[in-house]
Amino acid sequence: MSFRTLDGLDVRGRRVLVRLDLNVPMRDGRVSDLTRIERQAPTVRELAEGGARVIVMSHFDRPKGKRVQEMSLRPIAEALGAALGQPVAFVDDCIGGTVEEAVAGMKDGDVLVLENTRFHAAEEKNDPEFSRLLASLAEVYVNDAFSAAHRAHASTHGVTAHLPAYAGRLMQREVEALELALGSPTRPVAAIVGGAKVSTKLDLLGNLSTKVDVLVIGGAMANTFLAAQGIKVGKSLQEAEMHDTARAILETAKKAGCEILLPVDAVTATEFRADPPTRTVSINEIPDDAMMLDVGPETVRLLTERLSGVKTLVWNGPLGAFEISPFDKATVALAQSVAGLTETAGLVSVAGGGDTVAALKHAGVVERLTYVSAAGGAFLEWMEGKELPGVAVLRA
C-alpha cells in the first residue's frame, strides 16, 4: 500500500493538525503508562523541529459528547510536553474562538494540545461541519493514531476532505509492519491466535485460515475447537454453541491448505487462582473436574519446532491464562523462542492486541520482536482483512 508520509514535506511556518491517540491509562490524575505517548512523540518532535506550528488533537475515554472534567487532556498534555522535552500549551476546547486565538498566537516550533475531541458529539458522528471547523485550524493534516484508525470519526476521517493528509511516523511504522506480515509476507506464514472466545474472533480466524500456512490456536478458544472434535475438556471454559462454527473453520482451513495446530497437552487445575495444585496431562486425559488453563510443555516444544520453519509470524492473544501464575509459562516460553528466531533466523515477527502486548512485556521480549503494535481494535480489524477508514484516506 502506497501512502503519503512526512518524507520531503516542508512544514516550516505552516500550521499542522496532528491526530494522536492520547487515550492512555491514568491513575490519580496522572498518566500511569507512557508507552503510547513515547511512541507518538517522535512525529510531534520532527514537525516542531522542522518549524511547524503543531496543533495536537485526540480523544480520551468516552465522555459521550459532554464535557467531563476527569476526561480532560490537560494532564496528558503535560506528559506529552515531558516526553518532548519542551513546553506544550493547552486550550480547553478543540473548536471556536478561544482555540482560533491560541492558534493565531503560535510561533514556529510551538506545540498546542486541544481539548478532548469527544467532548463534542459531532466527533464520533463524523459530522461534516465539525470536521470543517477542525480542519480550518491548519494547512496540513498528519495522522499518527493508528490505534484509532478503525473509526471513521471527524478527527481521523472527516478532516481529510479539507486538508492534504499524511501519515505520521508511528502510523507509517504500523502500516509497514502489518503490510510486511499480512499484505505481502515472506512465506511460509504462521499466525498465533489466543484469547477466550471463538465468537469474538470469528472474522479473524476466517481471514487467517485462508491467508496463512500455519494457524496456531491457543487460549480458552482452543478448548472450543478441541470439544468440537469430541475431546472431553472437563470444566474448561468453552463455547458449546460455537462447535459447528469451529468445525467449519477447520474445514475451510483444510481446503485452503492451512495447517491448524491445537494443544496436545494441558496444564490443568480444579480452581482458577494463583498457584493452585496443577497437573500436566495429555489433551485426551483432562479430568472431568479440572480446567485447562495453559498449554503444556510438549505443545510448546512442538510449536517452537514448527515455527522454526516459517519466515513470518503474526501473533494475537496469549496461549493460556498468563495473568495468573503458573499459567503464564507456555506464553513466556514461546515468546522467548519467537524472540530468539527473530534475532537469529530472520523471522519477521509482528504482534499486537492489549493482552498480547501485556504478555510479551511480562516475557520481557517486546524489544526483541520485529514489531509490537500497541493498537488494539485497529490491529485486530487489520488482521481480519478490513480496510481501516483512517488509513484509507492517507493513500497516495
From Swiss-Prot:
Task: State the taxonomy lineage.
Answer: Bacteria, Pseudomonadati, Pseudomonadota, Alphaproteobacteria, Acetobacterales
- Report the EC number(s), separated by commas if there are several: 2.7.2.3
Instruction: Tell me where in or outside the cell this protein is found.
Output: Cytoplasm
Gene designation: pgk
Protein's name in the database: Phosphoglycerate kinase
Catalytic reactions on record:
(2R)-3-phosphoglycerate + ATP = (2R)-3-phospho-glyceroyl phosphate + ADP
Quaternary context: Monomer.
Q: Tell me the pathway.
A: Carbohydrate degradation; glycolysis; pyruvate from D-glyceraldehyde 3-phosphate: step 2/5
As one GO molecular function, the record gives: ADP binding
Hey, which family's this protein in?
Answer: Belongs to the phosphoglycerate kinase family.
Organism, scientific name: Granulibacter bethesdensis (strain ATCC BAA-1260 / CGDNIH1)
